[in-house]
């Protein structure tokens, strides 16, 4: 009810195509928020899933396949020093923010309007009413004391970004951004904005 309208219920998918319960056909640009980069019902992927399931469903402990995947990721993205596998994007963000706060001893997080980072309390925050303001809760159940630790800025506003770092830079544990944000109609950031943000992060 909170988002309005009637949600689509999907019945099946094949490749890049999905069908809803009424038989309407869509191109799937979501890909289950990332994991389905090979599309729906991919024969090779299905075969590997079945092969793996025959050796057990879930162990709740590390496996050889996790180590092999970690090595593959490291080979293709060599600047990654450490990695951790989790069950959802929300857990990944939650872990990253906790690590940043623990390592820096700082508490504030900077995020940007329209970017989605899971159901972490400190990410369910919208911009306040002032020019540079602490965030306010956008979801019932998120205390304002938690929301107040999150700064929220509009995308591509370089002046506000500079002002925010001047005011809060020494209190920030981390900055989180979605370079290709699906929830705001793919409002892409300017390269100069991202470069400025990267430089400010290194500086502070």
Language-model features: locations:
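Solvent-exposed alpha-helices and their adjacent loops that cap or buttress functional pockets
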Residues: 10-11, 74-78, 101-104, 116, ...
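Catalytic PLP-binding core of fold-type I/II PLP enzymes
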Residues: 171, 187-204
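A glycine- and small-aliphatic-rich helix-loop capping segment at beta-alpha/alpha-beta transitions
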Residues: 101-106, 125-132, 192-196
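PLP-dependent aminotransferase-class I/II
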Residues: 117-180, 188
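Glycine-rich loop-to-alpha-helix module at the N-terminal edge of alpha/beta enzyme cores
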Residues: 25-106
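Short, acidic, Ser/Thr-enriched surface-loop or helix-capping motifs
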Residues: 20-21
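Active-site-adjacent loop/helix segments that line or gate small-molecule/cofactor pockets in enzymes
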Residues: 1-12
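Conserved PLP-anchoring active-site segment centered on the Schiff-base-forming lysine
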Residues: 102-123
């Amino acid at each position: 009810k909170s988002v309005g309208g009637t949600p689509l219920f999907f019945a099946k998918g094949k490749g890049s195509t999905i069908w809803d319960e009424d038989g309407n056909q869509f191109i799937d640009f979501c890909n289950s928020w990332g994991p389905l980069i090979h599309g729906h019902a991919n024969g090779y992927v299905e075969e590997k899933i079945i092969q793996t399931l025959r050796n057990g469903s879930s162990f709740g402990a590390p496996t050889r396949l996790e180590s092999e995947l970690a090595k593959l990721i490291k080979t293709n993205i060599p600047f990654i020093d450490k990695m951790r596998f989790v069950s959802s994007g929300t857990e990944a963000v939650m872990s990253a923010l906790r690590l940043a706060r623990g390592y820096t001893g700082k508490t504030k997080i900077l995020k940007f309007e329209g970017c989605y980072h899971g159901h972490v309390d400190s990410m369910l925050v919208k911009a306040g009413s002032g020019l540079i303001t602490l965030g306010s809760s956008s979801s019932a159940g998120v205390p304002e004391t938690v929301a107040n630790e999150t700064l929220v800025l509009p995308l591509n506003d370089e002046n506000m970004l500079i002002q925010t770092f001047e005011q809060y830079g020494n209190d920030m544990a981390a900055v989180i951004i979605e370079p290709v944000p699906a929830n705001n109609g793919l409002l892409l950031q300017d390269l100069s904005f991202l470069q400025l943000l990267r430089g400010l992060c290194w500086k502070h």
